[in-house]
Every structure is written in structure tokens, then in C-alpha cells.
């Protein structure tokens, strides 16, 4: 997993509350067993005027010119500014996969659905909770200034505006450690590989019949 320390990027304002995971990545795209290929269908029902399906050539589809991600000024955005309860609805890790593959590494909102919030950390993304008044202010600044950028500093736990204002955010120490060091669940397990091998050796001596059955 790619480590996260500090990110500066163009902000895309998604001025909608209660954006659920089916809106982030629609159910028809969940059939793939891979973790890749979802970015092109991020917010599919909003980005396109025609219905999408897996394996479709999106270059032939009808773009919705009114949707925020399709506006030229937000091309290349890597920080998503959202409203309360972002990522609600059904549990699907495909949602952060789609956001990440599209190019978003940071999502800022007044609140997140718990499962989505946890899944972000497992996939190298930083979900930042800021007060609704602060999000309102950032929304206004983003709409008013083309190319508006923010900096998210995980080490210091602050969001920094172009004029130097800093907004502190909370993050669990363990999650912070994992992001700073690029550790997902597999990476954390591999860090304990010596201890795991030592445990297995002890168990092979204590209960050898279990391992015999496994080998068989």
C-alpha cells in the first residue's frame, strides 16, 4: 500500500449529503474479482446520461456536462470535499477502490459512515472529519476559486488552505501509523512473520496431527 504523509491537490466539491456507496460505485460493477477497473465508473449514474454496464467502452458514452467531476476546472482533482454521512449505505470496499483509482487520496466531510471510513484507511486513503461550518467555508472557497488547492498533513494532523489557515483533525494513532508507513492488513501481518513462524513451530511440536492433516 502506498504510504500517505502530506498531500496537496486540487479540490473537487461534491455538494451533496448522504452520498451512499451505490452512488459511489453502482452494484452492476461489483461482479469483478479484481481490485482495479472501478475508477472509470466512479459516480457512474451522475457522470453519464446513459446506463453503464461492466466492460463497456466509456469513451462512447454520453457525458453529463452538469456533473461536477466532468467540469474542466476539476480535472485532476485529488481531494474530494463532501457533505455529511458520506459513504453510507451497503458495505462495499469497492467504493474506496473506485475513489482511489480515479485519483482521490483524501476525502473531507463533516461525517462518514463507519464502514466506509474504516475501509479508506485499509486502502491508503485519508478520510478527514471537519466541522460542518469549516466544510461550508471550504465549499465556498472551492466554488469561488478555480484550481483551489488544499494540503492535508497527516503527520501534523492539519488541513492547510492556500492562505495559511490550518484546521486540525483527529485520527486514531494506529491508523495514522499504518498510513504513514503504507501498511495494509497484509503488510501488518508480514511484519509479524517471524513470530508467526515461531508459533507454528511450537504448535507443530505440540499438536503435530493438525499439521499432518493440513499437509494431506
Curated annotation (Swiss-Prot):
Catalysed reactions listed for this entry: (2R,3S)-3-isopropylmalate = (2S)-2-isopropylmalate
Keyword Hydrolase: no
GO cellular component, one term: 3-isopropylmalate dehydratase complex
Similarity section: Belongs to the LeuD family. LeuD type 1 subfamily.
Gene designation per UniProt: leuD
One GO term (biological process): L-leucine biosynthetic process
EC number: 4.2.1.33
Key words of the record: Amino-acid biosynthesis, Branched-chain amino acid biosynthesis, Leucine biosynthesis, Lyase
Protein name (record): 3-isopropylmalate dehydratase small subunit
Stated role: Catalyzes the isomerization between 2-isopropylmalate and 3-isopropylmalate, via the formation of 2-isopropylmaleate.
Pathway noted in the entry: Amino-acid biosynthesis; L-leucine biosynthesis; L-leucine from 3-methyl-2-oxobutanoate: step 2/4
One Pfam family matching this protein: Aconitase_C
